[in-house]
Curated annotation (Swiss-Prot):
The active site is a redox-active disulfide bond. Belongs to the class-I pyridine nucleotide-disulfide oxidoreductase family. Tyrosine phosphorylated. Its EC number is 1.8.1.4. It comes from Bos taurus (Bovine). One of its GO terms (molecular function) is flavin adenine dinucleotide binding. This is Dihydrolipoyl dehydrogenase, mitochondrial. Keywords: Acetylation, Cell projection, Cilium, Cytoplasmic vesicle, Disulfide bond, FAD, Flagellum, Flavoprotein, Mitochondrion, NAD, Nucleotide-binding, Nucleus, Oxidoreductase, Phosphoprotein, Redox-active center, Transit peptide. The active site is at 487 (proton acceptor). NAD(+) binds at residues 220-227, 243, 278, 314. Gene3D superfamilies: 3.30.390.30, FAD/NAD(P)-binding domain. GO terms for biological process: 2-oxoglutarate metabolic process; branched-chain amino acid catabolic process; gastrulation; mitochondrial electron transport, NADH to ubiquinone; proteolysis; pyruvate metabolic process; regulation of membrane potential; sperm capacitation.
Amino acid sequence: MQSWSRVYCSLVKRGHFSRISHGLQGVSVVPLRTYADQPIDADVTVIGSGPGGYVAAIKAAQLGFKTVCVEKNETLGGTCLNVGCIPSKALLNNSHFYHLAHGKDFASRGIEMSEVRLNLEKMMEQKSNAVKALTGGIAHLFKQNKVVHVNGYGKITGKNQVTATKADGSTQVIDTKNILIATGSEVTPFPGITIDEDTIVSSTGALSLKKVPEKLVVIGAGVIGVELGSVWQRLGADVTAVEFLGHVGGVGIDMEISKNFQRILQKQGFKFKLNTKVTGATKKSDGKIDVSIEAASGGKAEVITCDVLLVCIGRRPFTQNLGLEELGIELDTRGRIPVNTRFQTKIPNIYAIGDVVAGPMLAHKAEDEGIICVEGMAGGAVHIDYNCVPSVIYTHPEVAWVGKSEEQLKEEGIEYKVGKFPFAANSRAKTNADTDGMVKILGQKSTDRVLGAHILGPGAGEMVNEAALALEYGASCEDIARVCHAHPTLSEAFREANLAASFGKSINF
């Protein structure tokens, strides 16, 4: 009977039996756990299919590596495509159209409408369709590039092995030469406040509210806070953002741009309480929430009552249960995985990119790291200049920047010059009746080299890429000023700001 026991256990492990009716006399019962019949052999195994992970997997396959991508969620694309960048941009775009139609903007353009009605369900449907199309697109790209997709929770179970645990408890083992961790990040919890994604929500819940709240309080006036706050403010909510810092827009934004940005948002109806901290939140019997706040430095307490509380205090690396401790890979004080310039951990064939390593938590930063990392695996050069990674806030007007801010240049003791140009003096902005904001260029005083570009205005998120290219190739302000820009375009404001920085005077202002 002992030999039967061994055979039975082996068959159960391989998934051939889930149970044997009435048992076998003398055979001990073993827990059900099924395994794939054969491990998968791979050159590169990527854990995570967000912007960094899926791009890295495709690039690895294109370079000739046998590639596997392990993803714990049912759909590919990670936070960005499913509950982040993509759905938020759909809502930002559509809420902006509604705001224009519902307010006085359309009437001022000669477009008169008898009734404008919000169909929130339809708006959410359009958002979901965009997400579905893009996540499905990644699945198609995986097939096209012969990337093997394994759906399951990936854990590193050896320096050359990843085990994916599927929803049904079965596992798939991947024997691999290289491992790339691209597991992204998760919402940072607020101490003492429990997120239920109903009335106390994270960014995920804020993307799927069933109705427009009468009053919305946002904890945090960084990028995510002002974007999602703008969505619901445009759709009719009374929105107040409570920010611990003394400015809006988060880390890295130029202070002059931030002040102008805040002024424009306030003109739209967005309210801010800066230098203020949230000390707690209590749900009342009527379903509303009392949010307790006070000055960041301490002081008199105040209570704001709202229908929905949105917590936007940042994100933290997602590294739990990856098997790092067992491998001796220690995290830094901020929970990130330490890597060298080739994105290698202390174990040379295990790499990490994106939100789990140092640097800004941006999708495009993760994409760049993913491509460069696998090129390095193939023997290529590995280089990325984080000073050339742009940041964008997709409100209206948009805010975008790349390179150094004035505050950073002052802190580093670098002598610089400034060139500015307002969109109010730009012909295309005038014809569009969309003139809020400006372009601000920072150039090195001694060399004229572009050190930073800060844009507040329509199309800023597109325009900043011209600035990123200039920084990447070491262009001077004069170089940009002498490039012919099409007329009439918003990008002429970028040229004019560089004219002002290089020659001390723009043409049209």
